[in-house]
Amino acid sequence: MYGNQQNNSNPYQMSYYRMNNGQGQGTNRWPQQLSHQEMLAGHSQQILNNNKPAGNQSKPPIVMASNNVFSIGPYRQRKDSSRISVLQKYEIIGYIAAGTYGKVYKAKARDYQNGMNRDNVIILDSPDSVSADSNLDINSINRSTRQQEANDNLTTMDFRKPSHKRFTPPNNSNSTQIRSNSGSETNVRINSSSITNNSRKPSQIQFYAIKKFKTEREGVEHYTGISQSACREMSLCRELDNNHLTKLVEIFLEKKSIYMVSEFAEHDLLQIIHFHSHPEKRLIPPRMLKSIMWQILDGVSYLHQNWILHRDLKPANIMVTVDGCVKIGDLGLARKFNNMVQTLYTGDKVIVTIWYRAPELILGARHYTPAIDLWAVGCIFAELIGLRPIFKGEEAKMESKKSVLFQANQFQKILEVMGSPDHKIWPNIDSYPEYLQLAKMPKYRDNLTAWYQTAGGKDKTALDILYRLLQYDPIKRIDAIDALDHVYFTNGDPPVCENVFEGLNYKYPPRRIHTNDNDITNVGNDNNQANHSQKQPMHGNNNNKNGNMNGLGVNKRILAAAAAAAAAAAVSGNGNNPTSNTATGGSARKKRK
């Protein structure tokens, strides 16, 4: 069968092979007698023979590089030496705050060279940067049936396309109808100066927020993988694209640390509430209050329509830009909930800050719904009205992570305002694990109306939507789509504004930045220092005068304590050799047993 085939371009179809072992005359064998390795060797030898030039001067065959070139050590060194430091691209202005999972800094972009190698940077400015195998199953994102019936022309959110600009100023009017994620129309007043943060003039300085995720031990470089919170936040922020969610710009992987660069917001609701409550109480204007709530619910609606729970909504996580655009931030506790059979309780026994935690969570619910976010939104709404948390309880600290204590004091604060629930208000209340604890508590009547009037509230529609957001039964609690359709937002008195600061005759103070904090040690103030660090391999830079390990700096006292502990351990373990690991910033440490 092989003798009849004349195609000699493929060596596997040649009628006859001549194998040359390089040590003399080759051996003639039929293809049936050749192994796969011999066929490949014969093919390679034939290619080398065909590439030899005519004449006696033949070039030696190409020799493969040694295995050392492709080993992980030299490869990692080359990659580390060519990577871009976060300090090379951004100038750190100051330290903002620290949370459970990381520290946040304010920064601005440096004069950056486009020709630099950017292997350690994940650019997210364009939708093309989103990979096809993203963590979010885009095909599984469906809208509810009632939303499709409400607006057949509104298509499903596509993460790979930039968000649609819903706010389009008309030619000759200052008010228009805008369409929310739910498909409902709302009267909104448009200000020509209220274009969002992405449309700044080129002459204006663009600021960024850089979040550095905490490591297991500060000042110690180690490979222990990426935390669950960091994975969730990075994967979700890469996919989500909504005007009322903070936008992720890029991600840096540097010195075994992760840095998330996001758009910067000058204010947050906690700061605004503090401004209105100190030194004397001044209520938030009704139009500003309504506009803030509409934009929060629009962002929450977008998350829930895409099967995502935020699980940590509170005033400190609601940002407001200088243009008056409200943005939901900090998705460290967010997660998908499309699999309703799987419990959401495992591994996340404590979620949502205690003052904004829904009653079903306090009662030990294993399977919870997006209603927990709407309860938190109701608590935020009440705090914006009264300028203090409506349910300000004391959290009982857990002695063990294996069990979650019943937060009796927090639930009592809820009962004092909302009254005691019964089976008529909450039919399946007795099915929760901690129901017996609730049954032992004193009985209270509903005092929300009295609380609202005492806080200075006058709008009855605002009180009605507050009642619906703070329903005990999560099944009866209003969802984000219906909340956007509530008469409180649709009556147009006052109208919802894209710029929540519109009409104010005062300005809120900028966010407080700590420029003399020990943790940043004046990082980013010297451009020459950043350019010099660009030329030095990052893995060998242990003599940094500012002690800037792990990218954005480590407290010198921590390094000194670590060095002292290492010296003490060396003295106790080696007797006469106390200088094995000292004074080098902890670059050489003993392995943990």
Swiss-Prot record:
Ranges of compositional bias, category Low complexity: 186-199, 540-551
Major enzyme class: transferase
Gene3D superfamilies: Phosphorylase Kinase, domain 1 (3.30.200.20), Transferase(Phosphotransferase) domain 1 (1.10.510.10)
Keywords: Activator, ATP-binding, Kinase, Magnesium, Metal-binding, Nucleotide-binding, Nucleus, Repressor, Serine/threonine-protein kinase, Transcription, Transcription regulation, Transferase
Taxonomy, superkingdom: Eukaryota
EC number(s) per entry: 2.7.11.22, 2.7.11.23
GO BP term, pick one: positive regulation of biosynthetic process
Cofactor annotation: Mg(2+)
Residue sites binding ATP per the record: 96-104, 211
Quaternary organization: Component of the SRB8-11 complex, a regulatory module of the Mediator complex.
Protein name: Serine/threonine-protein kinase SSN3
Lineage of producing organism: Eukaryota, Fungi, Dikarya, Ascomycota, Saccharomycotina
Protein encoded by which gene: SSN3
